């Protein structure tokens, strides 16, 4: 139980798209629905890169935080003295420049995944946060689910013995009804190289999350081993990857992870009947069911024939029409880290975010996927069109 008043974290929201809307609706949920009595959240500012009117409309969509300041530019947002932490909810292509903008303004940052477009960018963000003594975290929300925490505990306790292999997939059937095209316009963020589009950075980060949190993350700190990577991709007509498979080998630990993603077929057409993730050990396996990014149940299957399915529903706030998506857990982590004076989360340390970016970068290199210099440079430019919105 918390003693005294809960710690309040004041958020500034950078961008007004769908992921920002979902995140903010979770921030507005009563923390009591998830048993959190030590932290709370307040949205104090929202910015669109194009107009304050879009920020005002955003507050109507989330149905709350009506007293929040609304801005028509990102520099105005990061200059707001009332903002404790900036949530960067822009496309992957913008993450490096936008996060640097916030860090250089002295703001703590929660940056959406994929963290950056390149590993060099990720290293630069970490160096900057460390030098300025600011909190920085990649928003891989799945890691903070009670389900994920429990699974890591089961593995660490030896429930399925030594884990030798994790197989994980997140795929969608985005085929157009006509021809060989996908249903996305070429300008859409999912397939547009100018926005760092493609299956790996948007979808593949989730199966890699399961590979890393069950294999790499649980390695002893003094014996961390980054994987060797073998990957293959099929490219879409835009040049972005539509289909990628990544094999991560950890030879010193005798383990292997297989992460796959495609925009041509569903992981599970029936949505929750077959495991999207299989964590396989010497005494059995843990199966995690679709959706890979927001799982609601897992199953422990032992080699002796024992099996147990565990449901892990996400709580909803009855005062907000049952709203509750599961993003509030990562927000709570940010609040607790800042309350306790931590610059990074132990659940997803900076080093691990960098290694994951190195893995994705190498997979994309092997697949022949390239992105424009504007979004791959690791040179911060406050006047970049990614920061100003002036394309």
From Swiss-Prot:
User: What superkingdom heads the lineage?
Assistant: Eukaryota
Kindly name one Pfam family recorded for this protein. GFO_IDH_MocA_C3
Gene Ontology terms for molecular function = D-xylose 1-dehydrogenase (NADP+) activity; nucleotide binding
Which UniProt keywords are listed? Answer: NADP, Oxidoreductase
EC number, UniProt record: 1.1.1.179
Would I find Oxidoreductase among this entry's keywords?
Answer: yes
Main role? NADP-dependent D-xylose dehydrogenase catalyzing the oxydation of D-xylose into D-xylonolactone. Also displays some, albeit lower activity with D-glucose, D-galactose and L-arabinose as substrate. Probably not involved in D-xylose degradation, as it has been shown that H.jecorina assimilates D-xylose via D-xylose reductase and xylitol dehydrogenase, and it is unable to grow on D-xylonic acid as sole carbon source. May play a role in the regeneration of NADP(+) in the presence of D-xylose.
Q: What is this protein called?
A: D-xylose 1-dehydrogenase (NADP(+))
User: Which species?
Assistant: Hypocrea jecorina (strain ATCC 56765 / BCRC 32924 / NRRL 11460 / Rut C-30) (Trichoderma reesei)
- Give me the gene this protein comes from: xyd1
